[in-house]
């Protein structure tokens, strides 16, 4: 009961905060536009203040509005009253926007289904990107000799989109039919993960490391684990997501294992480009079989790594995508 009361209190306190933030952006935005002599206004997808505040600034100044949608807005799992505001404002904001940037083709298709084919003329796909210089070159088949214990690595935050799939992997490793540990590198505190039901054990190690260390950690893995969950409260989010860590994984030089629903764009993207082993059913036996094959089939590992690098340089290179972004923001 105490936890429920605390959650209700947080919700009530959040109501004035979102409106105050929107008001601050709407008040300061026009001043900044005039001071900088800005040609466009860019609003980034969030839980409301940036999207709505950017829209109000656009209306006040008459400057074109560009949206950068890292995630869905309407239909996302947003704190109250963010979901209500998103349902009201997203159609209005999308109608007025000059350009809409999304991070994958799946999200573009989603918005075309939601708002009609004409919205597609406004949408530019710019995939999540990193600079490849942070990663070593020619990593194919590096450290692929047989080992007494293999390492499955997950890097990044853990919350509802990944949670049940990570728990499923932990359960599979607990059967001792796979000669591997799961090494989690997450900025989430161990207490937070424990509250989610994730704790250290015989087959699970929980670590933390600076962002600068992540390339080295990913390069040392035997498998890079990329999960999305089934039966969540935000299926639209699951189906349109391309997690930011995918970009890092593609260039890390180690095979990727995607454990996610068949309906997700992530699974479709991986299959189209053959850059990852994919388990698209919530099936523990299938997950176990694919992991064991991926650990021992060196030709398959090499093929996936090579295709991952090709996909990175085709869609995820920051050198290329920065030019696309610049062109989109200035046209």
Say what each PLM segment does.
Residues 23, 27-31, 52, 56-60, ...:
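Membrane-proximal helix-turn-helix segments that form the acceptor-binding/catalytic region
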Residues 61-66, 74-92, 132:
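Nucleotide-sugar donor phosphate/pyrophosphate-binding loop at the beta->alpha transition
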Residues 78, 129-148:
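Acidic anion/phosphate-binding donor-loop and adjacent secondary structure
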Residues 93-122:
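A short, active-site helix/loop in glycosyltransferases that binds the activated sugar's phosphate group
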Residues 106, 126-129:
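Carbohydrate-associated surface elements
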Residues 149, 177, 186, 191-223:
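Nucleotide-activated donor-binding/catalytic signature segment of Leloir-type glycosyltransferases, i.e.
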Residues 161-164, 212-216, 224-250, 256-268:
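Nucleotide-sugar-dependent
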Residues 282-288, 298-329:
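A charged, aromatic-enriched C-terminal amphipathic alpha-helix characteristic of glycosyltransferases
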């Amino acid at each position: 009961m105490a936890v429920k009361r605390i959650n209700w209190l947080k919700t009530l306190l959040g109501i004035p905060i979102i409106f105050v933030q929107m008001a601050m952006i709407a008040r300061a935005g026009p001043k900044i536009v005039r001071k900088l002599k800005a040609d466009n206004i860019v609003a980034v997808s969030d839980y409301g203040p940036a999207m709505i505040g950017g829209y109000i600034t656009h209306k006040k100044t008459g400057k074109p509005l560009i949206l950068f949608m890292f995630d869905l807005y309407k239909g996302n799992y947003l704190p109250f009253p963010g979901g209500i505001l998103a349902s009201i404002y997203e159609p209005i904001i999308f109608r007025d926007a000059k350009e809409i940037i999304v991070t994958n083709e799946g999200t573009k298709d989603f918005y075309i289904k939601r708002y009609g084919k004409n919205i597609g003329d406004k949408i530019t796909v710019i995939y999540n990107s990193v600079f490849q210089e942070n990663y070593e070159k020619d990593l194919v088949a590096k450290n692929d000799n047989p080992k007494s214990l293999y390492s499955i690595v997950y890097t990044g935050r853990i919350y509802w989109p990944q949670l049940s799939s990570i728990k499923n992997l932990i359960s599979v490793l607990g059967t001792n039919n796979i000669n591997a540990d799961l090494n989690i590198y997450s900025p989430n505190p161990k207490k937070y993960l424990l509250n989610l039901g994730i704790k250290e054990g015989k087959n699970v190690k929980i670590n933390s490391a600076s962002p600068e260390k992540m390339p080295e950690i990913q390069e040392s893995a035997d498998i890079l684990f990329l999960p999305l969950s089934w039966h969540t409260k935000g299926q639209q989010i699951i189906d349109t997501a391309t997690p930011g860590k995918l970009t890092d994984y593609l260039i890390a030089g180690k095979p990727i294992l995607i454990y996610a629903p068949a309906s997700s764009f992530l699974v479709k993207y991986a299959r189209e480009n053959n850059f990852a082993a994919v388990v698209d059913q919530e099936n523990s036996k299938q997950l176990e079989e694919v992991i064991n094959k991926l650990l021992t089939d060196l030709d398959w590992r090499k093929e996936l790594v090579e295709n991952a690098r090709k996909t990175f340089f085709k869609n995820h290179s920051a050198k290329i995508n920065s030019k696309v972004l610049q062109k989109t923001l200035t046209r």
